[in-house]
A protein has these predicted regions:
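Boundary regions of SH3-family modules and the immediately adjacent low-complexity/disordered segments
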Residues: 1-17, 25
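A conserved glycine-rich beta-strand in the N-terminal activation segment of trypsin-fold
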Residues: 90-91
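Aromatic- and glycine-rich peptidoglycan recognition patches
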Residues: 2-7, 32, 68-72, 94-134
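Residues forming anionic-ligand binding surfaces in small-molecule and nucleic-acid pockets
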Residues: 20
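Structural motif
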Residues: 81-82
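Catalytic cysteine-centered active-site loop
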Residues: 27-78
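A generic structural signal for residues embedded in beta-strands
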Residues: 85-86
């Protein structure tokens, strides 16, 4: 049997690793495939491949996924897998300083320093609204 084949019941365990495989995928509002994906689709698909059902849209993810760990400028040290929410946007932390997201700025899935992204996104949408740990 080929090494890349596994039973349908097997699930991968790392949504961040799945999201990283989608770097350079084109941005497509409403998309959730490797042909085009948006920010909440990236989070939903990455978790679905790992066997975790998440809501489709970022506003529903912001209120219904995991544990709320902070709001606005108030948050603990961010960890791999934490979700960061702005109005109409979500990103997934790859580590404490880097995030993965489907960016309308680059029109693709990118790896970006959290500090740089927060500054750039903040000019349009302000501080993140919430931080959640799935």
């Amino acid at each position: 049997v080929a090494a890349h084949v596994s039973p349908l019941t097997d699930h991968l365990k790392d949504p961040v690793g799945i999201a990283a495989r989608l770097i350079d995928t084109p941005y497509l509002w409403g998309g959730r495939t490797a042909f085009g994906i948006d920010c909440s689709g990236l989070v939903q698909l990455s978790h679905a491949i790992c066997g975790n059902a998440l809501p489709r849209d970022s506003d529903m993810q912001r209120t219904g996924v995991g544990e709320l760990i902070g709001e606005g400028a108030d948050h603990p040290a961010l960890k791999r897998g934490d979700l960061v929410f702005w109005k109409g946007h979500v990103a997934m932390m790859e580590d404490e300083a880097t995030m993965l997201h489907a960016s309308g700025h680059t029109m693709s899935v990118v790896r970006e320093p959290y500090a740089d992204a927060t500054k750039r996104i903040g000019h349009l949408y302000g501080l993140p609204l919430a931080y959640r740990r799935p």
